[in-house]
Amino acid sequence: MNEDNQEQIEGRAQYIVGMDAHSKKLAISIWECSDLWKPMLYKEIRCCAITDMEATYKNNVPKDSITIIESSTNSATLKKRLEDIGFRAGIVRADIISDKERKRKVRDIQDARNLAKAYIKGNIQEFIWVPSDQYADYRDVHFAHRDTVKEMTRTSNRIWSICSRKGYNLPIRSGATKGESIRKMVEQLQISGFIKERLEMLVADYEFFLKRKEKLEKLMAEAIIENDKMLALMQLPGFYYHAAFVIAAIVEDAKRFSSAAKLTAYAGLSPMVNTSGEEEQKAMLKGGLGKPLDDEGRMDLKFYCCEAGQTILNLCSKSDIGKWGWRMINKGKPKNKVCCAIGRKLITYAWHILRGDPTPNRDGEGVFKRKMVRFYSELGKQRMIELGYPTRVDFANSMSARFYGHLPESIKAKE
């Protein structure tokens, strides 16, 4: 699902530029639109190297123009490069010109023309949100951490597969000691030949990814200390610093969503409104009831919210939202569906927090302090002392005062 946060288009320019970009080249179609009823083709550049884009624009594209770029991997970078040299640009959905005509005319310059014509005709009303440089870096950290965890898990599964196939003692699953336990096993069983070489190679890969994961988690923790939005999200039950970092990095500015329901839909946690009997039957075969969730939305947001729902049901059952979840389960609702419902509630609360709405009461203060006590160790005592927090208690009290200090002391936190 494309973000509902799109930037509103500013006043129309005299020249409309459609751009179809690839990894190494792009096609440009420029239209003169002083009369919107009779747009005239001004110039076309059928093939231009991306490295020459700035020079091409300065020599061929008028300043009073706006460039329409189809969403792709490098579209945000191209938009920023154009803005750096004084040209306006906007990114539109990748399906904005997907129709029968496009299927018949699969050419770069034709796509560029169609983008320009779609804007001229008024079919493009808004642009896709582009994250700021800082939050783009946060997203890169998140993607790197996600990929590292995947590679570490794959490597661990390969080690397990070899040990199971050869009848060796299966290695323990804890990360830091896995490599040493496998080396001891190789020595005790006197394993030799290619299998020994293969296990040693996989252990080296596993330890590399483990160190990489720890380094990226340190970067996340450092970012959270400096970002009040991320810290504030940790007030929510089921959200530790990984979830808080990812949700804040992906959303950035909650005000780009007009309501919490829009953010919920963006996360893919809203049930389908118009569903066919076939879709509902497929959902029932998977154990679901009623209308299923759609397959759209940001999977990273959906993942962390549903995981938080599982955590609340298993570990925070005495909280208000945990009690609500178990009431639904006791009424016969499937547990997985209840987890999604809790995740939908959490992303709604997150919308209010990211908007800067003040904490309404002290109900979650106790849980938040315990999270801060645990979070103290993520950066290490030496780093925390440098930041001015000599003990865990000092850090927890300081963070708690930041979000709960405006509330009267008479409103006590629930245990």
Question: What role is predicted for each listed range?
Answer:
Residues 8-32, 115:
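Gly/Thr-rich phosphate-binding beta-strand-loop-beta motif of the actin/hexokinase/Hsp70
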Residues 325-343, 347-415:
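Low-complexity, acidic/Ser/Thr- and charged residue-rich accessory regions of DNA metabolism proteins
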Residues 83, 90-127, 279-296:
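Short alpha-helix plus adjacent loop in nuclease-associated cores
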Residues 116-140, 181-191:
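A short, charged helix-loop
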Residues 146-232:
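Glycine-rich, often acidic, oxyanion-interacting loops/wings at catalytic, nucleic-acid
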